[in-house]
């Protein structure tokens, strides 16, 4: 929050963010990971306090970041109100070996963000995603498994994501990216 006049502050605004995470465990079809996020600002914040869309595309092949838009370029979309939905369905382990335990996943990510009074921010053109941003993905968790102990291992995930918003043919690095993720298995 910012308070005009407090410590010579020039901006008055308040913000509220909500983040809900839930994992649904199904007997036959794996797990559904669900994350919903929303945020709202009152007043007129400075540019560095606006909500920045959680984007993680920095190239054609990059690191997978949970609960972020894999195909959205970083630091492009700004808002003072937003709603995001991240859903990932795992299908279960396809097979198990000492060095591989691949688990198919399907992902859908959606977001909407609106920037009111964008002209109040001088010196830069700010974009919002008020028409929505949608992407889908598929890949394998634990494609490579590196055992550390009998009950503990390091896993490497690989997935591809496509930006549905662009409605353009597949273009690696623009609307399609390949992501590599890392995690611990126990």
Label the model's feature ranges.
Residues 1-186:
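Exposed, low-structure sequence patches enriched in small/polar residues
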């Amino acid at each position: 929050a910012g308070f005009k006049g407090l410590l010579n502050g020039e901006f008055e605004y308040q913000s509220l963010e909500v983040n809900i995470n839930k994992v649904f465990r199904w007997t036959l079809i794996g797990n559904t990971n669900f994350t919903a996020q929303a945020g709202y600002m009152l007043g007129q914040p400075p540019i560095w306090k606006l909500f920045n869309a959680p984007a993680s595309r920095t190239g054609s092949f990059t690191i997978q970041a949970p609960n972020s838009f894999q195909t959205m370029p970083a630091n492009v979309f700004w808002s003072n109100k937003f709603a995001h939905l991240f859903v990932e369905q795992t299908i279960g382990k396809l097979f198990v070996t000492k060095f591989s335990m691949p688990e198919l996943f399907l992902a859908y990510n959606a977001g909407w963000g609106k920037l009111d009074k964008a002209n109040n921010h001088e010196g830069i053109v700010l974009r919002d995603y008020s028409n929505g941003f949608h992407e889908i993905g598929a890949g394998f968790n634990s494609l490579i498994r590196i055992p550390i102990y009998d009950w503990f291992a390091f896993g490497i995930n690989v997935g591809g994501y496509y930006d549905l918003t662009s409605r353009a043919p597949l273009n690696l690095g623009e609307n399609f990216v390949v992501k590599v993720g890392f995690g611990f298995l126990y």
